[in-house]
Each structure stands twice: as structure tokens, then as C-alpha cells.
Amino acid sequence: SRFVMNKAGIVDPMRMMPRLEPRSNEEPSVMCEIAVAAAKQAMEQANVTADDIDAVLVAASNMERAYPAMAIEVQAELGIKGFAFDMNVACSSATFGIQQAYDMVVSGNARRVLIVNPEICTGHLNFRDRDSHFIFGDVATAVVIESAKHCRSDHAFEILDTKLQTIYSNNI
């Protein structure tokens, strides 16, 4: 960002310091809203409905609010029965969510698990820090983990193996 070729928009304070409008407790949170949009796409691509999902995991580096659990909010918005919970493992949250879902499917605790990774980073970024502000953004991804015998999609991936590892670093 130090070598800007086209400065259009970069001096706009609303882009440099975006703000999320507060929502009432009766409204879905912003994280829930983007998570639901991603979840619907993943479910459509997997050819499954809310009735086919046994569990919802929301795995994110930070949560918009502490409670209720974001996963339960997403579960309610999608009309999914079963259970839901949040996971927070910083940058590795999505990876750990996939591992947890895989373990649940392999053990027989769930037939299908929806993992959603909504990230809202703009709320706590310093957009004036030209060395790092461009790395982070707001996004949501989702995936359905299921066994091959339950798979309904022609475009599925196979999980061949998994292994998790964490290493402490304060170099953020």
C-alpha cells in the first residue's frame, strides 16, 4: 500500500475506518448474516437441506459477541436441528473446525456437519498501519463434511488424512 498507483477511495474515512452498525438482540448478528449466506451456498453445493445436517460448527478467530454462541444463532437461522457450538483457535479456527467435523463423522456422532468460518476483522484493525491492514478482511466460508456413503454432490473432495499442530508465536 506504500506504492499506490491509483488513490481513488483510499482516503475515504469510511473505507479506512469502517464501523458496524449496532443491532438489537432480536436481529441476527453481522457474523451470523454472512455465515448463513456462506452456509446456504455450501449446503446447495452439497445437495443437502437443513434436515440433513446434524451439527453446526462456527470456527472463527474472533466472535462479534460472546453469547449466545454464534453457531447456535446460525443453526436457528438455517432451521437446523441437532447441536451447534463455536470454536476459536485464532487463524487456525477453520482447520480445527474441519478436523472436529471429520472426527464426529468418522466416530459416528454425526452424519453431516456444517462448518462455517465467518471472519469480521475490520472492527479491530488499524487501517492506518500500512504494513498489515491489507492482509485482513471480512469474509465467510462454509463446507459440509460427510462420509462418502452419504455424499450427494458430484463435486466433493475426499479427506485423505489430517494432522493438527500449533506453535506459539507473538509475532503478529
What is each of the regions a protein language model found here?
Residues 59-65, 89-93, 117-122, 163-165:
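Acidic, glycine-rich active-site loops and adjacent beta-strand->loop/helix elements
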Residues 1-54, 78, 161-172:
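Conserved "HGTGT" condensation-loop signature of ketosynthase/thiolase-family condensing enzymes
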Residues 1, 40, 44, 129-172:
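Condensing-enzyme catalytic core mediating Claisen C-C bond formation in acyl metabolism
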Residues 108-140:
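Flexible, glycine-rich active-site loops centered on histidine and acidic residues
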Residues 27-32, 56, 84-94, 134-136:
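Active-site nucleophile and cofactor-binding loops and adjacent substrate-binding regions
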Residues 49-55, 82-83, 111-112:
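Short acidic capping loops at alpha-helix termini that bridge into adjacent secondary structure
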Residues 31-45, 88-116, 143-148:
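Active-site-proximal alpha-helical scaffold in enzymes
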Residues 69-80, 102-107, 130-135:
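A glycine- and small-aliphatic-rich helix-loop capping segment at beta-alpha/alpha-beta transitions
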